[in-house]
A protein has these predicted regions:
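Conserved catalytic core of the tyrosine transesterase superfamily
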Residues: 1-340
Length: 340
């Protein structure tokens, strides 16, 4: 069974377990989004609904929440809930907090749920729609400059600026780490997408990988000739390792297990810290480095959006607005009027 299928099965089982403690109309809602969302997304939506139900009636089991009770909720009630989840005590008496980004996501989940209830005549109105979605301050896109990319890759390839202890580990894993870094820098894939890759997802003949995006959409992403060379070397090294037939992962840990998202984050940070001190580089910064370079080379924001897997080009435009303005400013004298 592929890792992707294992993940889907895991979240499907968790969703079914949660649904046993939910009223029938929630089960119908989850069923309605089954074909349009991933198993992970369905589970996350359900967790957000469950949390809201627990707050709504703390003495009533979630499966006994009624449509009549939901119909009584006002805009002010929803505002009270959003204020509550900023800082609260969970069912295990642990203190929990949520930042603006998390609150925005939870509100989005509930808005979708209540919109469905209203559209399907379960509720007479959609009060939560009156809630203003919290605005999140836009962060400046941090990316590596061309010289920094070279320093970063040299750190991986040659072990430059590493400690003696790190060098011992580096000699065993440098081929794998170089393949990971080059693949991410030449495709812009997310760290989760990289960690989930199986060997069968790699098509060396056509220089592409097959990935599943957030939301469950499948996509084909092409990598560069440089990345291809390092991937080929890693695949040859992997083929010579004693690995159980059941292990399908492309990238493996020293224990011959699938390399986790956290492990990739740590190895990227390790090399970047030595090569580019003072600049906080994460796998997501590799993604933004790729996107910045692609936009600077092509000027095609639609290509960048499609390659990154953004469903809404507005997201891409917002992130790379400064680059777009700079490009327009640089081209202001391209059209000549009187002078030739």
């Amino acid at each position: 069974m592929s890792h992707r299928l294992q993940t889907d099965t895991h979240f499907t089982d968790k969703t079914r377990e949660l649904l046993q403690k939910m009223p029938d109309f929630v089960r119908r809602y989850i069923r309605s989004i089954h074909n349009a969302t991933s198993a992970r997304t369905q589970y996350e939506y359900l967790k957000d609904i469950q949390q809201y139900f627990r707050w709504l009636s703390q003495t009533t089991p979630t499966e006994n929440i009624t449509l009549e009770l939901l119909a009584e909720q006002t805009k002010e009630d929803f505002e009270d809930y959003l204020e509550y989840i900023e800082h609260y005590e969970d069912e295990n008496q642990k203190q929990r907090t949520n930042g603006r980004t998390s609150i925005k996501r939870k509100l989005s989940s509930l808005r979708k749920f209540f919109a469905w209830l209203f559209a399907n005549d379960y509720l007479p109105s959609d009060e939560i729609r009156k809630i203003t979605i919290p605005k999140i301050a836009k962060k400046e896109i941090i990316h590596m400059e061309e010289t920094e990319v070279k320093d970063f890759l040299n750190s991986i390839q040659k072990g430059e600026n590493l400690t003696k202890r790190q060098m011992g580990y580096h000699q065993k894993q440098s081929i794998r780490d170089m393949a990971i870094a080059c693949l991410m820098l030449s495709t812009g894939i997310r760290v989760s997408e990289c960690a989930e890759l199986d060997v069968t997802d790699v098509d060396m003949q056509h220089s592409c990988i097959h990935i599943t995006r957030k939301g469950g959409d499948e996509s084909t992403v092409y990598f560069s000739d440089e990345a291809s060379a390092y991937l080929q070397t890693w695949l040859e090294q992997r083929a010579g390792m004693k690995i159980p037939d059941s292990e399908t992962a492309l990238f493996l840990s020293s224990r011959k297990k699938r390399l986790s998202v956290r492990s990739i984050e740590i190895l990227i940070a390790k090399y970047a810290k030595r090569a580019i001190p003072g600049k906080h580089i994460t796998p997501h910064k590799l993604r933004s480095t790729f996107a910045t370079s692609l936009y600077q080379e092509t000027g095609d924001i639609y290509l960048v959006a499609e390659t990154l897997g953004h469903k809404d080009i507005t997201t891409t435009k917002e992130h790379y607005a400064k680059l777009s303005d700079s490009r327009k400013r640089d081209n202001r004298n391209k059209i000549k009027l009187l002078s030739q």
